Amino acid sequence: MAQHFLHSKESRNFAKALNRVTEDESESYLALCRWGPDNKQACPGCGVFRKHYRRKKRRRWRCAEIACRHEFSVTSGTPFHGHKLTFKEILLLIFAFTTNANGASLLQVSRRLGLTPKSVQANFGKIREVLIHGLDLTPMTGTVHVDGGHFCGKPRKPNHKIRMPKDAIAKRYGKKKPASTTKPWVEMGMTKQNYLRLAHKRVVIVFTQAGKLGEGSRRSIPIVCRRECDEYAFPLMKAFVRRDAIVMTDESGAYTGFTALGIEHHQVKHSEMFSTSEGVNDNMCETFFSRMRRAEYGTYHGYRPKYLQDYAIEHGWRDDNRRASQDELVNKLTGQIFGSGKSNWWRGYWQGNHRQGELTADWFLAKAAA
């Protein structure tokens, strides 16, 4: 049997080097990821890219342009702008984010690095924000699997099984139930608390593009929606899948009308089989949801609707880079982080600067159209 990738030496080829890294080496590595190997820097004040004056003791640079003279560090103008961490701690945080296949627990990283859980939460939130803004939304081609998975709003099992007699509702309210006294949770045979939890239920509709034979999924676009229906599925399909693609889904009614869009569409009835004899399946979506659910139960112990999209994008990134070596993951993510601007959603989070509301499908559709 072939060896799993996580058993290979490439999956751990950065850990030993990171254990011996110094503060100077950490700063040099972050500068390399941000500005390249030419020993030149881009001044955040005037934007001039050249070799600026180094202030070694303060670990900063001063702009060489006379009209500017702006002072900056390697983290200025990045998501880590105004941080109170050492450069090695920043590098260790990025490493901790990438090294776990199903995500990293805040308390586990906090104990490992000696940082407060608040600091880990805010900085991990900044990394997820970078992944959201850096998500590749170009329309998919080739074979594309589409499916929806339900998260959040999970009901809790009661201590005693609620068994409602068939005529219990009629005995209590008569033949016609008054609208003011109707209790839908009684009709559904659940507690009021569980009925209220259903309001937090969300659906993640994921589009996965197949790679070569045996390669599995190559790219994922997970979008959080209120329901799994054509109201959400059709606009997302138009925006993220090309008309010459071959789309495979399950038998859900949300996807039955895809042929009207001029797309070759095949469905598999999951009530009867996982895959048809012709090979029609949506197993790449099921693989994505399997990893995301394992993280929900085993790592994060639950998602919340407001930040469910952040976690979905994180797991999409992990799924797309599942075969990358350890140093490739760190290099790629660090370059992406230090190539972006300041954080808007997590800068000053513990001082009350919170993102308002959930990220919706309309947000991604507008971004794709821009």
Predicted feature residues:
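Residue-level recognition of single "structural anchor" positions
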Residues: 1-370
